[in-house]
């Protein structure tokens, strides 16, 4: 991870921890989740909003006024709305996408859920996803949601990432290992 990305992730994580703790104290995790989903959708749909949070040309006051208006219009959770206003004052709105990801992860962890990133050479069938979900749930002891992607360069097998753990049973990695072993011998 590059240094600026890790700095952004660190900033986002600190805000996420505070927002989550306050929402939890207020027993409003559902409202927080709704706000996260709404903001994620708005960021995906609105180039103007993405420009607002990323542009250094927009002043603090303009950013704060705009994000406050957006929060009011979207009827966001008060904790989230106040945090966005504070982030605008501190010129930290550029970390909003990472903040939303960190908050989503915190909510999933509070519910005892974890997301597994699964890459396969071809699309997994519904039965394969169900079996993999069951197996991973037993291994990690939590409810697992699978985020499946197709990567034809794997040739065959799977690459599974759950949290900081990765299991690579792809043909590509086995061929790379074999190639490295042959280089050592020859």
Curated annotation (Swiss-Prot):
Gene3D superfamilies per the UniProt record, alphabetical: N-terminal domain of the delta subunit of the F1F0-ATP synthase
Subunit structure, interactors included: F-type ATPases have 2 components, F(1) - the catalytic core - and F(0) - the membrane proton channel. F(1) has five subunits: alpha(3), beta(3), gamma(1), delta(1), epsilon(1). F(0) has three main subunits: a(1), b(2) and c(10-14). The alpha and beta chains form an alternating ring which encloses part of the gamma chain. F(1) is attached to F(0) by a central stalk formed by the gamma and epsilon chains, while a peripheral stalk is formed by the delta and b chains.
A single MF term (Gene Ontology): proton-transporting ATP synthase activity, rotational mechanism
Keyword Translocase part of the UniProt annotation: no
Family assignment from sequence similarity: Belongs to the ATPase delta chain family.
SUPFAM superfamilies to which the protein is assigned, alphabetical: N-terminal domain of the delta subunit of the F1F0-ATP synthase
Main location: membrane
Compartment annotation: Cell inner membrane
Sorted UniProt keywords: ATP synthesis, Cell inner membrane, Cell membrane, CF(1), Hydrogen ion transport, Ion transport, Membrane, Transport
Protein's UniProt keywords contain Transcription regulation: no
Role noted for this protein: F(1)F(0) ATP synthase produces ATP from ADP in the presence of a proton or sodium gradient. F-type ATPases consist of two structural domains, F(1) containing the extramembraneous catalytic core and F(0) containing the membrane proton channel, linked together by a central stalk and a peripheral stalk. During catalysis, ATP synthesis in the catalytic domain of F(1) is coupled via a rotary mechanism of the central stalk subunits to proton translocation. This protein is part of the stalk that links CF(0) to CF(1). It either transmits conformational changes from CF(0) to CF(1) or is implicated in proton conduction.
Membrane topology: Peripheral membrane protein
Top-rank taxon, per record: Bacteria
Pfam families for this protein: OSCP
Organism: Ruegeria pomeroyi (strain ATCC 700808 / DSM 15171 / DSS-3) (Silicibacter pomeroyi)
Entry protein name: ATP synthase subunit delta
GO cellular component, one term: proton-transporting ATP synthase complex
PANTHER family: ATP SYNTHASE DELTA CHAIN (PTHR11910)
């Amino acid at each position: 991870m590059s240094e600026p990305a890790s700095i952004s992730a660190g900033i986002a994580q600190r805000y996420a921890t505070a927002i989550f703790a306050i929402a939890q104290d207020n027993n409003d995790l559902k409202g927080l989740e709704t706000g996260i989903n709404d903001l994620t959708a708005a960021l995906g749909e609105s180039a103007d909003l993405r420009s607002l949070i990323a542009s250094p040309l927009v002043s603090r006051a303009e950013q704060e006024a705009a994000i406050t208006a957006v929060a009011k219009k979207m009827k966001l959770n008060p904790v989230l709305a106040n945090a966005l206003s504070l982030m605008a004052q501190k010129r930290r709105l550029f970390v909003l996408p990472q903040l939303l990801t960190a908050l989503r992860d915190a909510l999933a962890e509070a519910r005892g859920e974890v997301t597994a990133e699964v890459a396969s050479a071809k699309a997994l069938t519904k039965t394969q996803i169900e079996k993999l979900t069951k197996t991973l749930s037993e291994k990690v002891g939590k409810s697992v949601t699978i985020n499946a992607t197709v990567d034809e360069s794997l040739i065959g097998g799977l690459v599974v990432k759950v949290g900081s753990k990765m299991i690579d049973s792809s043909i590509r990695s086995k061929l790379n290992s074999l190639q490295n072993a042959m280089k050592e011998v020859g």
